[in-house]
Amino acid sequence: MRVEAIVEVRMTEDRGKVLKALENVFTPMRIEERQSDMGTILVATCEGHKCLEKLRSAIWRQGIQDAARSVISRGIVGEDTVVFSVNKQAAYVGVVSFVTEAGESPLGPITFTVKTNDVRQFIDWLAPRTYRGRVYYEAPPPD
């Protein structure tokens, strides 16, 4: 599994705070900086499921597996890719709030692109189905 997280650091934002927001939900192996008209773009990448453990833990801690599953499932692109976004400001305080519409996150979201051999297993691992608030199938970590 390969994961890429992209987040914009606007000119009015503190780079350290944006980096903290990213690292509250993601553990990157590498971070590259690219310049844009609006500021700097941070492109964080990693291989394997461990880099998404913080995101998964927050989803489980907040009890939002079903909502997360619904949003993430709508982001399936082709057979091996999932794209979804979380609110940068919420991530800064350790909370996961999914962004479902453009403009919903005024300072821009953190956008994840996950490439995996088994999209369904990835979703079952990150945000499994629940019944009456209890997970009834916990999938093993994806490739």
UniProtKB/Swiss-Prot annotation:
Pfam families assigned to the protein according to its UniProt record, in alphabetical order: RNA_binding
Gene3D superfamilies given in the database record: 3.30.1440.10
Signal peptide start-end: none
Domain of life: Archaea
Similarity-based family: Belongs to the UPF0201 family.
Listed name of the protein: UPF0201 protein PAE1632
Organism: Pyrobaculum aerophilum (strain ATCC 51768 / DSM 7523 / JCM 9630 / CIP 104966 / NBRC 100827 / IM2)
Upper taxonomic lineage: Archaea, Thermoproteota, Thermoprotei, Thermoproteales, Thermoproteaceae
